[in-house]
Amino acid sequence: MSKDAGGGQMNSNLKTSLSECMEALDLFLSNNFQEALDQLRAKSKDSMYHALTYATMLEMQAMMTFDPQDILNAGNTMKEAQAVCQRYRRKSTVVDSFNSLVHKQSLDQFTEEEIHAEVCYAECLLQRAALTFLQDENMVSFIKGGIKVRNSYQTYKELHSLQQCANYAKGESHCHFEGGVKLGVGAFNLTISMLPTRILRLLEFVGFSGNKDYGLSQLQEGTTVHSFRALLCTLLLLCYHTFLRFVLGTGSGNIEEAEKLLEPYLKRYPKGAIFLFFAGRIEEIKGNIDEAISRFEECCESQQNWKQFHHMCYWQLMWCFTYKQHWKMAYFYADLLSKENSWSKATYMYMKAAYLSMFAEDDCKPFGDDEVQIFRLVPSLKLKIAGKSLPTEKFAIRKSRRYLAQKLVPLPVPPLEMMYIWNGYAVIGKHQDLTEAMLQTLVRAEKSLEGVTASEFLIDDRCVVKLLKGLCYKYLGRIPEAVESFSYIQLNEKRIKYDHYLVPNAMLELALLYLQLEKKEEALRLLENAKNNYKNYSMESRTHFRIQDALQQAKSLPQNGC
């Protein structure tokens, strides 16, 4: 349909579609999940916005469950949405591509619907790539999306350029288009800026570039535009500040910014499960553990239709009770997850056994469970998503294997070690009482290692405890003891037999401590050493993300003594 012949009708259809999708989004945020999906599904084969919104909601579900079937379903639905968007794109030859049109032909050859089709198509590609990364934390898998990622990136770049053109005429639904461009440009800039240097160089070689501050500003602007994408911009920023900065960073998210973003949504949707969850997470990383527990419990009570929200809360509640060293409650939530959620049975069972190992001798163990038997079960629960094992699961399986030996040597503090993998010490570090209590537990563990018979695991176990003690010392301001703890691991590097991840992570933690003390040169030496001289160790990708974050922090500091 040409612009002159039916532009008015197309604009009317576009406006109606956007209005209906906004209504469905409102239902979704009010916990009416199935009603929202049903409304969208009815038109998902014909309307690009219905198709995209429907697929986005299914992808959100997959991100909550990690269920292989949910992931497959979300991926297929997003692929179908992409095909719907393709039907609305401007028909052109390979040579006469969209990119060529922007630069070489008059912009008025695009109808408003065709412009929206471009941004929706790019968003489908971006979300499919995100789903790939969800399955494997290694950015190589993201890059393997290859043409999907590159086409999406290039399209967003061209659309962004289009907006800046003097002869670009804004359509009636321009705010939704603008929000889509800000979402894509912001997401790409932010994601690329976080990548470890080795991957960043590869991406830059093939034409990608990312600026963290620009990405954040684009997403921030996207939250203020009254558009279909404002929510997605908000959720992405909330995820960045409250999760990515911790799991794939050094734990320095902008919590004040997260609170500002969340406030209007909590006001409008006081029982909205998504927003109650983020409210709980914000309290958690502020160190207000009891308040966080209340919020997560409130989130579970707010709706019963999507158990996936409950599972996200159970995971956070498990950690909240870990921080408080309430082992029975932490076990309770790990047990619930092992029975109800499919993300990683191996990880959940590992955590169950880990908590049981912390029970006092006279504690009654639930259902007569025995941690040794559960640890032995963990390797058999290995799950592959899209042919890949989850990094956390690999870690749990490696740790559990020592329990398969006839003469077993127990792990010293398994839940506290896994807590480090998820950057939990950055959380309790804001709460002196919790940090002191954790340190005392580690001191007792260290003393117990002094009296054991020497084994092949002894040095590794001592170094694990030293790393965790060093973190507690750091957050308590006991700097010399923190330095001694991290340095102990480096001194014993050649004696470590299995836990090779300890050395680069000890260097990373010592470097972060030096950055705190404004010893930039010493910090940079450690970070470069950790980045360049160690490989093939547990949770390597996550460590490299954190090293990259630390290197970016170092750039903002003056030289030593300046």
Curated annotation (Swiss-Prot):
TPR repeat start and end residues: 273-306, 463-496, 504-537
Record keywords: Repeat, TPR repeat
Recorded name of the encoding gene: ttc39a
Protein's name in the database: Tetratricopeptide repeat protein 39A
Family label: Belongs to the TTC39 family.
